Design a protein with these regions (language model features):
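Short, well-structured beta-strand-loop connectors
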Residues: 20-31, 58-68
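Short beta-strand-turn/beta-hairpin segments enriched in glycine/proline and small hydrophobics
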Residues: 1-13, 30-46, 73
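Short alpha-helical linear motifs
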Residues: 52, 69-73
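Short histidine-centered loop motifs in beta-beta connectors
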Residues: 16-20, 53-56
């Protein structure tokens, strides 16, 4: 099994985490909701698999390139 890292594209605040470790996600499923410059930005999975790590908490300020979620996929 391979791991896919979901990383932040910009500086933002983590508004909502919509998945938990162990959740099975499909490509296109929402993982997180971020806020940047008063805009809400959904973070969608690019792969199908199982969430194995959530590296952020709600309310955290993240930087571009920060690890958000790790997904194990076939």
């Amino acid at each position: 099994m391979a791991h896919f890292d979901v990383r932040a594209e910009m500086v933002a605040n983590v508004l909502t985490i919509t998945v938990r470790v162990g959740d099975v996600v499909a490509s296109g499923d929402q993982l997180l909701l971020l806020e940047s410059m008063k805009m809400e930005i959904p973070v969608l999975s690019e792969v199908s698999g199982t969430v194995v790590e959530i590296a952020v908490v709600e309310g955290e300020v993240i930087q571009g390139g920060d690890l958000l979620v790790k997904i194990e996929h076939p």
